[in-house]
Amino acid sequence: MRKWIFLALILFSGILSKAQSFNSHLTFQKTSYPVAAIQVPYPEDVVTSAVKEYMLSRGFAEAHYKDFLVFRSVPLDAGDSRSSDAYFSIVQKSHSEKDITIISLLPVKKGETLTPASVEDSSSLRFALSYLDSMRYHMHSYSIKQQILAQQKLVDKIKSKMLVLKNDSGDLAKKIRSYESELAQNKKDQEKQTREISSMSVGDESGLAKAHKKMDKLMDDQTDYEKKLRNYKAELEKNTEDRTTEQSIFDTANSQLEALKKRLADLK
């Protein structure tokens, strides 16, 4: 089931990754503002980090105004000498669609506080649409890289657990061989002790008592060895089952990791 959900997410993300920016409206302090917007198939926190990294890589420091992420003096169009303060609103699409985020970009006149009068004209809004489109690759690239990091961490964790199980398997096999050897030697010692008891004189009560005491000890050891062997063999059987399960989990997780890497490569 997890595999199919993961594949469905890849297909769904692929569809959304082709989405273009669009004109929308954003309500702030009971006023509706025209904004450029784009929808991306990633959680809000990841998208927020992606926007920050994108803008920082271009030399723009982040600021905050109310719920807006603000970057000052941003040239939204390379062919326009003007620059605007870029007000970003980054929110999840809905409570039922937490892995889809809407990025809204509102261009505000440089250095002015957000009010209806400070909003740039319609040409800046067109530039804002293009600016969001230019960010699409970075949004998807950054988000997929974060997924790859998380998935790689999961794969490494599974590999670590598999290594522990493998080492445990070796230790258990070694203990089983050791106790099988002890049990085989114990059997020989009991046979030898039986012969010694049979050859002893009936009148040698002291010698017989010691011989029987030694035999009792050998039989107690036999019981102990057999119990430990049963336990270790049961542990080894469980270990083998766990290793099979972990191998299956690893194969699935590693396939998901490779799928993510392919998605990243396909973006380029």
Question: Where do the model's predicted regions map?
Answer:
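Bacterial Sec-dependent N-terminal signal peptides
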Residues: M1-H25
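Sec-dependent signal peptide cleavage junction
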Residues: S17-A37, E44, L129, D133-S134, ...
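Soluble non-cytosolic domains of exported or imported proteins
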Residues: P41-D45, S122, Y142, D251
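Structured segments of extracytoplasmic/periplasmic soluble domains
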Residues: A50-A61, S134-H138, Y142, E182, ...
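Soluble oligomerization/assembly scaffold segments of membrane-associated complexes
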Residues: V91-R177
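Long, charged amphipathic alpha-helices with heptad-repeat/coiled-coil character
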Residues: S169, M215, D221-F250, L257
